A protein has these predicted regions:
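Glycoside hydrolase catalytic-domain context in secreted enzymes
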Residues: 1-231
Length: 231
């Protein structure tokens, strides 16, 4: 039932050009104590047969959905462009879980992310961790080397630090960036983008905080001014 419901939602969203983060991968069947902070978390133990036939099956069903059509603009030999259509996987995004599988955090589990998800199921998309800002055990380096794409985090001291002199950092960083860009490119996020287009980013969190601080202050000043004018 889980697989059927998730598959239906993922496929219909994909037909509209959306990518859907299927979660939480995997064996995350309880909310209590799944991630109590720092190094504490639920550790799930199971045999391989049960994992494959029960706990991974809904995710596998999503990964093996029929492909969907995507419209795009194709460059011609004469330099002109025309509308074209291709097929893409219906499921291109996934979120890992807080818990451990055995003693290994699911979001940094090589056999799960690279062995099964990317290797056996042929998944090429975006793998993100569950949201956390302080959990030391959810190591970003472990995540990226296991086959993950990015961490859903907000504190600088928990983010992946790229070493420009490290060959392995370039290797894993390139693979992670490719999976993210692949997912975005194969969605309606790039709809209408042509050579020469200018992509404008959204405001940063700092800009938004400044705006949300100044705007109420200005409204308060105007309100006080109107009150005193009435009197």
């Amino acid at each position: 039932m889980s697989g059927s419901m998730a598959s239906a939602a993922v496929q219909e969203a994909a037909k509209k050009g959306l990518y859907t983060f299927v979660k939480h991968f995997a064996l995350n069947d309880q909310e209590n104590h799944r991630g109590d902070g720092q190094d504490a978390a639920a550790a799930t133990w199971s045999g391989e047969q049960a994992i494959r036939e029960i706990y991974l099956k809904p995710f596998e069903m999503c990964m093996k959905l029929d492909p969907v059509e995507l419209n795009y603009v194709e460059k011609q030999d004469d330099g002109s462009y025309k509308n074209a259509t291709t097929t893409i996987p219906a499921c291109n995004a996934l979120m890992t879980s807080f818990n451990r599988i055995g003693v290994t955090w699911a979001g940094g589990h090589y056999n799960l992310l690279t062995g099964v998800l990317r290797g056996e199921w042929g998944f090429n998309g975006f793998v993100i961790t569950d949201a956390n800002g302080y959990l030391g055990r959810m190591d970003p380096r472990q995540m990226i080397e296991a086959g993950g794409s990015g961490s859903l985090r907000y504190l600088k001291d928990t983010q992946f630090t790229f070493d420009k002199d490290s060959v392995s950092d370039y290797h894993y960083g390139r693979k992670a960036a490719h999976s993210i860009l692949y997912t975005i490119a194969n969605s309606k996020a790039m709809n209408g983008a042509m050579p020469g287009s200018t992509l404008v980013g959204t405001p940063t969190d700092k800009q938004l905080r400044v705006l949300l601080t100044i705007l109420p202050a200005l409204l308060l000043v105007l309100l006080v001014y109107r009150i005193f004018r009435v009197w």
